[in-house]
Amino acid sequence: MLILLPAIAIAFLTPHGCWAGPETKKDRMPIPIIKAANGSAEGWQPKEWSGKARYEVIETEAGSTLHLSSNATSTALYKEARFNIKDLPTLNWKWKATKLPAGGDVRKKSTDDQAVQVYVIFPRWPEAVNSRLVGYIWDTTAPVGSIVTSTKTSNVRYIVVRSGEADLGRWLSEQRNVYADYKKLFNEEPPEAGRVSVMIDSDNTKSAAESFVAEIYFSK
C-alpha cells in the first residue's frame, strides 16, 4: 500500500481552494457509483500510486459496482463527500473479493497489500500532512479486528474488517460507525469529512488481486 498524505490532501482541493462534496440528506447520503461514457466511475478521481490497476463500473447483483483488479500495482479512486461525520456517522457498503494478494499483511511494510480498502478521509489544514485517514480493509493475513497504524505515516489507521479466503467470492454487507472509530483511533473529535476512497494494491507483494465494491452510503 502506497499512500502519500500531502499528495492526497492537495488533490482534494477544488480550484478555489475549498472543499466540495454532495449535499447531505437528513438520514442518508449516498456515494454514487455511476458508469461514465468510457466505462470508468463518474465523479471519482483516480490516483495511480504504482503502475496502473484496472477499474471500471459494471452491473452486478449488488447493483452499480466498482470492479478493481491489480497485477503488482496500486491504485485509488476518490469521491468528494464533505459533511459532518457526527451527523451521519455510519458508513455502509457492500464488497466482494475474488483474489487476495499472496502473502499480504498490513502489519508489515514489505507486504502491505490488500484486495480492497475503503477509506474515509478527514482533511486538516493548513498542513496537508495532518490529514487523517480511517481505512477499512480486507487483508490476506492480519486477523479480523486488528487495528493497525500505517507503516508509512501515523495519520493513516486501519481496521481489518475481513481477513483471508473464507468469504472469497461472496458479497458481504458492512457497517461501521466512523465517528466512533475515528475517536478510538485518533483519541480526538473528528474534523469534517472530505472524501471517500476505494483502493486496491498488490505492488509490494508483486502479486494479483481483484475486488468489487457497491452501494456506499452514510447514514445515522
Where do the PLM segments sit?
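Extracellular carbohydrate-recognition regions
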Residues: W19-W49
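Extracellular beta-strand elements of beta-rich domains used
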Residues: A36, V196, A214-F218
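Extracellular/lumenal carbohydrate-interaction signature centered on repeated Trp-anchored short motifs
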Residues: E80-L91, E165-L168
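Solvent-exposed strand-to-loop "edge" motifs in beta-rich extracellular domains
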Residues: K94-L100, P123-W125, Y179
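Extracellular beta-strand ligand-recognition surfaces/modules
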Residues: D113-V118, S154-G164, L168-S207
